[in-house]
Amino acid sequence: MSKSIINLQSVENQQILSITPPNTGLSLQGTLQIPGDKSISHRALMLGAIAEGETIIAGLLLGEDPRSTAECFRAMGAQISPLNSEKVTIQGIGLGKLQEPLDVLNAGNSGTTMRLMLGLLASHPDRLFCVTGDASLRSRPMSRVIQPLQDMGANIWGRKNNTLAPLAVQGKSLKPIHYHSPIASAQVKSCILLAGLMTDGKTTVTEPALSRDHSERMLQAFGATLDIDSQTNSVTINGHPKLIGQTVIVPGDISSSAFWLVAASIVPGSELLIENVGINPTRTGILEALEMMGADITLENKRILTGEPVADLRVKSCQLKGCTIGGNIIPRLIDEVPILAVAGIFATGKTIIKDAAELRVKESDRLAVMASELTKMGAKITELPDGLEITGGTPLKAAEVDSYTDHRIAMSLAIAALNAKGKTIINRAEAAAISYPKFVETLQQVCGDSN
């Protein structure tokens, strides 16, 4: 097997990743353990902090986003052990007992931290909380959670007519509501359910389509009472449950697996086994989309871990074919659209991704950025108002591209570079550490690069 040359350099406060695949003979091989699921890691930290007693989390993602969550809840009184191993212990403080912090809470780059936490902060009477984030997070819309919280009686102030962070939250007693969300968003749903923990009565969220359900599963595991109506995509939570600390085993993140599923599919002669991956049905849109494209993926050793379905994923290279991806599947693969765009480049025919306008308000405008950066590499890709149109079959050439400090962009471009001719340079590659601290090491491993 010929080797790629993969180098990561630090230059002037940024990391630059360069990837030079061999002219012939590259194939990806190996068995991978991927980082813990980011969505589940956030929720385990939050619920452990507000539950009574001890919570033990095994397999926690040690990325920057969960660290932001841990720091915020430490500042409000929870005792959380250092995030320097994948086993973390939390001494919870009990529901309704978050302390007023001495300083501003910083959510970093994490929209999940800020949006979910707002539901808890708004429902703690007689306490003032100030929340901010990095430049990217301060530009992301918060009205989608602030509006329903205000409907519950919350007092929240922010920039741009209370839509952008930094935010000030004056906690108070909230009233239960039935909120009909205009978008399928697990962050919106989870924020309202967490606010509902402290209300007198039942709080309901109805969505236009099913979004990921990690919050519902974990709330039930910690002792909350929920009524879930899958026919109407509605979830109801009863206020004032007794939450008890739990042992949580975090499965591998299917969003992180997606990079290797696509990489092994598009690099000829490849075969990877990705172990211990969460296959929650609200997250498996990526598997269904790749199946539509003809990918050779098998699920082995299916099992249940702490209420979440898990399997090992075996993927072998094959010729992908273009297809149209849209509708209700989009909320179930929203984070995987950038890497799906890469799959489309190497598929025969045309791939259309639609109904994904939500990607314009992620860590970057992911539709615009993927179109611009892949075009630099020679891809035939056109931006749509709510998606991308990709014509496959055009060989990629090396180029200098930019992550725009977006972790999923950085990693998607790295996978594209494996099939590009020449040396591709990815600027601001440090963004990958937000959700996948050892991404470059794993890339070197599967490519047989010992650098």
Curated annotation (Swiss-Prot):
Keywords carried by this UniProt record: Amino-acid biosynthesis, Aromatic amino acid biosynthesis, Cytoplasm, Transferase
Subcellular location: Cytoplasm
Example GO biological process: aromatic amino acid family biosynthetic process
Annotated positions binding phosphoenolpyruvate: K38, G111, R140, Q187, R366, R408
Classification via Gene3D superfamilies: Enolpyruvate transferase domain
Pathway note: Metabolic intermediate biosynthesis; chorismate biosynthesis; chorismate from D-erythrose 4-phosphate and phosphoenolpyruvate: step 6/7
GO cellular component, one term: cytoplasm
Family that this chain belongs to: Belongs to the EPSP synthase family.
The protein's name: 3-phosphoshikimate 1-carboxyvinyltransferase
Gene (UniProt): aroA
